[in-house]
Amino acid sequence: MIRIDTPENIYAVFMMRNDSPDELDVIPRVLPSQVHGDNIIHIHDDNAMSYVLPERPKADGLLLTTAKVSASIRVADCAPVMIYGEDWVMILHSGFKGTVLNISRKGLELVKRNYGDDSVKEAHAWIGPCIGRDDYERDANEEWSIRGMNEFHRENYDVKDEKVYFDLSGEIESQLIDSGMKSENVTVTGINTYTNHECYSYRRGDVKERMTLYARIKKGLPV
């Protein structure tokens, strides 16, 4: 388990192989049905209970601004991203398609609408374990690969022998900075899920198992 360094008011962890998120369910939890898109749900006091398990709303991101519920996403090679301020936290499932769609930028636009431009300038971000550049190979002529080469910064992919290798965490970092975050406020774990056997990896054969990014706003709740 990785405990993420956050303000005192926010509790966040990343659950690795053999860690169980069930032990963290001290309050109802929101776990979306992830569809490799860019839909983000704002979870606040008025709507929080309508989204908790066993409900599974279709989304790849959650902006949490209430202490009534916790938020989580599940990954195995896709990048878990957390962006947070003093009293809000956003978690994103940024797989290849989500990164091509720039879900990080969309998330920060949602934060700006709710908290103003300065909220993004002062925010912090954490990019968790995901598949590494050397191990994420795609056919260069495939539709989404072409879209990726059009959308990714050139330094974040390589083309070799009709294959393209994408740097997910590098591109997400670039997107966050382009969207107004300070580079010194973006933390990249650099853990490659494909080569690190403490992680689940879909490409390595973990078809069903997933790791969990979990966050909640404490406000006096037990940790």
Give the ranges of each region predicted by the language model.
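Active-site microenvironment for binding and transforming phosphate-containing groups
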Residues: 1-223
